[in-house]
From Swiss-Prot:
Reactions it catalyzes: precorrin-6B + NADP(+) = precorrin-6A + NADPH + 2 H(+)
InterPro entries in the cross-refs: Precorrin-6x_reduct
Lineage: Bacteria, Pseudomonadati, Pseudomonadota, Alphaproteobacteria, Rhodobacterales
Main enzyme class: oxidoreductase
Keyword Signal: no
Biological processes annotated in GO: cobalamin biosynthetic process
EC number, as in UniProt: 1.3.1.54
Database matches in NCBIfam families: precor6x_red, PRK08057.1-2
Organism: Rhodobacter capsulatus (strain ATCC BAA-309 / NBRC 16581 / SB1003)
Entry keywords, A to Z: Cobalamin biosynthesis, NADP, Oxidoreductase
Name of protein: Precorrin-6A reductase
One MF term in the entry's GO annotations: precorrin-6A reductase activity
Length: 251
């Protein structure tokens, strides 16, 4: 029997959930629980971690999961690695639904860095006005460069004081527009943009805006994840499911 587990949290995951529901697949959608108001899904939904590889192995076995689609954020490396290990142990088929990374276009002023520490080091020594578009989890890393003013864009309001001495938070959920991000960068007199190379259309607006304004971008490259099947499109995922014996209810 086909029973799918979708590891979600991205726009792609939501599109997949709708397609699976429309086609009558038995599936569960899982959120990590890092945002306060996750987008409602048309599938039964669970929120929270699994408890590492052992916990995920237990869940897959207990729930009779036949296929896992990892549609988490490209920077959710630990969850993705856990999924690879757990599926290998249980024999469950695994596919990553992963958007392609962004690639530089004419006019881009990108500096690629491997991690957050390198992103901090790539900022200038002189005080700058930095648009920090990396989410809330790793803001504290930038306290190593306290001379800068940081503009943050967060999905949820911060629960306490920001961990940076000179920072302001804008609360907003994407997708964002090029016009809106251009106006934001211009009105805040931003001099540098720091972002993760998440890929996808929903968050690309800030990079296009930075290009139009001639701003330098420090782009954090994706972390390494163990080898697994990868599909970059919804059609590719549905084809992978068919190739791996997944069928809707009653088929």
């Amino acid at each position: 029997m086909t029973r799918l587990l979708v590891l979600g949290g991205t726009t792609e995951a939501s599109r997949l959930a709708k397609t699976l529901a429309d086609q009558g697949f038995e599936a569960v959608f899982s959120y990590a629980g890092r945002t306060g108001a996750p987008v409602a899904q048309p599938l039964p939904t669970r929120i929270g971690g699994f408890g590492g590889v052992a916990g995920l192995v237990d869940y897959l076995t207990r729930e009779g999961v036949s296929h896992v689609i990892d549609a988490t954020h490209p920077f959710a490396a630990q969850m993705s690695a856990n999924a690879v290990a757990a599926c290998a142990q249980t024999g469950v088929a695994l596919c990553a639904f992963e958007r392609a990374p962004w690639t530089a276009q004419a006019g881009d002023r990108w500096t690629h860095v491997p991690d957050l520490a390198a992103a901090v080091a790539a900022l200038p020594q002189a005080p700058a006005r930095v648009f920090l578009a990396i989410g809330k989890q790793h803001l504290r890393d930038f306290s190593a460069a306290p001379q800068h003013h940081y503009l943050l864009r967060l999905v949820d309001p911060p629960e306490g004081p920001l961990p940076l001495p000179d920072a302001r938070a804008v609360i907003a959920r994407g997708p964002f527009t090029v016009q809106g991000d251009t106006e934001l960068l211009r009105s805040e007199t931003i001099t540098h943009v720091v972002a993760k190379n998440a890929g996808g259309a929903g968050a690309e607006a800030k990079l296009i805006a930075a290009r139009s304004l001639g701003l330098p971008v420090i782009l954090i490259d994706r972390p390494a994840v163990p080898a697994r099947d990868i599909c970059a499109t919804l059609e590719g995922v549905m084809g992978w499911l068919a190739d791996h014996g997944a069928t809707p209810r009653g088929v």
